[in-house]
């Protein structure tokens, strides 16, 4: 999903089934995809039959800004960047409207009961992927975030302690890492 959609679209005020993508890291993929099928999916093309069998849903439009995947290992690494961003943005979108619209959310399907290629924060072998860390970052007790719709920077206090007199200092980088 486009991370901006988590900010722009209101869902149910208490949403008990939220989630996004979740391809595992390369080590996870090696455990169940035969070597001859370790082919990076190509945007808008039907994926390899093994990837299809394991329910891969294409999201290359979010991976390609990091550069077209050269191989399955490169794809898995870039997928982790997208996984992190998806779940961080998911929680930030909820936090942005918490108590104004939202009252809570629960992640649906944190893992898969089989070797699947979507909707998981940790795989069948209990190996976490970047979704888990993005979720944790977006849900941290004191979190600084930028609304991609209006560029407003907000500090969200998800903790139990009041926080006062805080200052945010931010620096912006482009996709090449230049400020």
Give each language-model segment a name:
Residues 2-164:
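Substrate-binding clefts and catalytic carboxylate motifs of secreted carbohydrate-active enzymes
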């Amino acid at each position: 999903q486009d991370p901006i959609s988590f900010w722009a679209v209101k869902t149910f005020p208490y949403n008990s089934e939220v989630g996004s993508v979740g391809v595992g890291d390369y080590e996870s993929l090696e455990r169940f995809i035969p070597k001859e099928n370790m082919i990076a999916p190509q945007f808008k093309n039907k994926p390899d039959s093994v990837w299809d069998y394991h329910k891969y849903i294409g999201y290359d439009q979010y991976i390609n800004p990091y550069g077209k995947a050269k191989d399955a290992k490169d794809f898995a690494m870039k997928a982790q960047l997208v996984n992190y961003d998806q779940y961080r943005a998911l929680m930030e979108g909820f936090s942005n409207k918490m108590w104004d619209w939202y009252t809570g959310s629960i992640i649906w399907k944190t893992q898969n009961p089989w070797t699947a290629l979507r909707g998981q924060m940790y795989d069948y072998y209990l190996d976490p992927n970047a979704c888990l860390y993005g979720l944790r970052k977006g849900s941290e007790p004191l979190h600084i975030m930028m609304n991609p719709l209006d560029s407003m920077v907000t500090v969200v206090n998800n903790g139990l302690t009041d926080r006062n007199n805080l200052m945010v200092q931010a620096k912006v980088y482009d996709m090449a890492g230049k400020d």
